[in-house]
Amino acid sequence: MTDSSQSAMPPAKGSAVKGTAFSILGAISVSHLLNDMIQSLILAIYPILQADFHLSFVQVGMITLTYQLTASLLQPLIGYYTDKHPQPYSLPIGMGFTLSGLLLLSVASTFPLVLLAAALVGTGSSVFHPESSRVARMASGGRHGLAQSLFQVGGNFGSSLGPLLAALIIAPYGKGNVAWFSLAALLAIVVLLQVSKWYQHQHRATKGQPKSPSLLKPLPKRTVAYSLGILLVLIFSKYFYLASISSYYTFYLIHKFGVSVQNAQIHLFAFLFAVAAGTIIGGPLGDKIGRKYVIWGSILGAAPFTLVLPYASLYWTGILTVIIGVILASRSPPSWSMRRS
């Protein structure tokens, strides 16, 4: 996931941060895992929600739209505000929104309440990501690539766990078992309270200190505009594809191959796990053959497998989606955003 607060400045000279704070990086990575696990859980139970509320595919899309409007569009606004006014305790507060959304979803009896629950979970995500990414950078001790990699990998593997846990805990027993995942949100709140205390201490220690001068020569405006344009196209295409697969892949498997909801959720887990693995594989591969080739290869490489997908058997559908997930995610390993080509 692209987080708006990666532009936060590294700790200035004289900061209380001495070296890489691995305990904080571990805590924020675990919190990211729990947060993104809960986010993907919402997508994984779409077939259950459709059956319970007799939803059309348009209504399923409305759930995704509501979630994305709060989780994605709010995030840069919150990041912009917290860049100017850091809010250390926004981390547990954001997870509180997620907790509220989970509890509401577990007892929701109407479609509007499901939409409200999705909005609360999305709001929690939009509050969590900017400040948690900032914390990862602050705790890096200058090793920004390592810090962002640990942070992002936690989120990616959390995303893959959601469908698997939904298949084991929710699908056999019903929507009410969503409430059990509030324990994960509570655990994240406890962890984030400790992280927030550390964050507040670092903020006070560096307040009023001059920012470290940049050692990089500014790029021409035309180069920056062109690079940002390409980046936006890549991000849009990746997340458009991911949102489409995450929202409708389970329905596709159920309707075309007649598999159970649990089986479909396990296939979704395999796809999202492949996405997480692709993020890790893309880094060393890019270092070896060049990041530019990996980026363009990931764009063109997924296309032939996608075109074959509608004609594949269930077995080959599972294989193809895993390959697509690895290729698609290899274009954006987390540490690349911290480097200059």
PLM features: what roles do these ranges have?
Residues 40, 68-76, 159-160, 272-280:
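Residue-level signature of mid-helix packing/kink "hotspots" within the transmembrane helices
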Residues 42-43, 224-276:
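Extracytoplasmic gate region of multi-pass secondary transporters
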Residues 54, 86, 107-112, 141, ...:
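Helix-breaking motifs and short loop linkers at transmembrane-helix boundaries and internal kinks
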Residues 73-112:
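Conserved MFS/SLC helix-loop-helix module at the cytosolic interface between two early adjacent transmembrane helices
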Residues 117-154:
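Cytoplasmic helix-loop-helix junction between adjacent transmembrane helices
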Residues 151-198:
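Helix-loop-helix hairpin linking two adjacent transmembrane segments in secondary transporters
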Residues 181, 194-217:
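Flexible cytoplasmic inter-helical loops of multi-pass small-molecule transporters
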Residues 286-335:
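C-terminal transmembrane helical hairpin of 12-TM major facilitator-type secondary transporters
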